[in-house]
């Protein structure tokens, strides 16, 4: 293990993708949890707000459950150049 490898951060997109995959896999085992989309929306807003100033009303999370797979759709209106 090198010192330089320890100090490097993982790419944010990859970390977020891994978290969503884990969350969706877990969610598939918890059928009937209607509040999952609301919980996801609040957590996603919190993560984005750390880096960019956003309007919470302009973030939409849609979770569609199908028989074979579920889809998670996230719409975020990003401001022009405003940082948190």
Swiss-Prot record:
Gene3D superfamilies reported in the protein's UniProt record: Cell division topological specificity factor MinE
Keywords (A to Z) from UniProt: Cell cycle, Cell division
Transmembrane segments: none
SUPFAM superfamilies: Cell division protein MinE topological specificity domain (SSF55229)
Keyword Cell cycle appears in the UniProt entry: yes
UniProt keyword annotation of Ribosomal protein present: no
Pfam family, one: MinE
InterPro entries attached to this UniProt entry: MinE, MinE_sf
GO annotation (BP), single: cell division
Family the entry assigns: Belongs to the MinE family.
Biological function: Prevents the cell division inhibition by proteins MinC and MinD at internal division sites while permitting inhibition at polar sites. This ensures cell division at the proper site by restricting the formation of a division septum at the midpoint of the long axis of the cell.
Protein name: Cell division topological specificity factor
Species whose genome carries this gene: Granulibacter bethesdensis (strain ATCC BAA-1260 / CGDNIH1)
Gene this chain is encoded by: minE
């Amino acid at each position: 293990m090198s010192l330089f490898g320890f100090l490097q951060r993982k790419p944010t997109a990859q970390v977020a993708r891994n978290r969503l995959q884990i969350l969706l896999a877990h969610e598939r085992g918890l059928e009937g949890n209607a509040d999952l989309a609301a919980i996801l929306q609040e957590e996603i807003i919190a993560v984005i707000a750390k880096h960019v100033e956003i309007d919470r009303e302009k973030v939409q999370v849609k979770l569609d459950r199908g028989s074979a797979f579920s889809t998670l759709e996230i719409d975020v209106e990003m401001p022009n150049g405003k940082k948190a």
